[in-house]
Amino acid sequence: MATLEEKLCPVCFQEAMEGGKCQNCGYVLDKASVGKNYLRSFSILNTKYLLGKSLGQGGFGITYLAKNMLNGSRCCIKEYFPSNLIQSRMPDGTVALTGEENRCEFEDGKQRFIEEARTLQELRGNVAVVDIQDFFEENGTAYFAMELIEGCNLRAFKKEHNEEQTFKMALQMLLLIGSALAEVHRFGMIHGDISPENILITQNG
């Protein structure tokens, strides 16, 4: 008999996995979403976030799909995980640094990560800025929970639409993004990573 973990889908969080495929949302088990440094699916963070599949890893962090067990909503969890400073992850989820000589740099970066989450939380309601719902420390590092954006990024949009449609969408978005960046800069923050991959378009535009 399958265990609850084997039946639970890491995307829709329904007990609908059969033979590696979710009978509810259609998700097919993807081994590429289980990296050696990723937290295990269905780990629990901050006593209320049930982790699902990993959505990707950048130079400074790993993003996971998650479910808020208090209200049942899905969200994204961003983990502070600078790959140049972290050597590995321990079995209990704690991060292990490449060396104690990097401790100060890691802690400084972690505090900036938390401060940025706190600042972005103050911008909730701005349609061009993702809502930050929570932030906390655990496993020797830091995390923040943000709203799940259902849609695609600008690069994916470009592949599926003609140049005129892409240009109109990009122009509309640049006006919103410019306004949002002005607010972010007012708080003394610099994004530093504006790219088509990081510009998200919701399903309703």
Describe each model-derived feature in a short phrase.
Residues K67-R74, F81-L85:
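Conserved N-lobe loop of protein kinases adjacent to the ATP-binding glycine-rich P-loop
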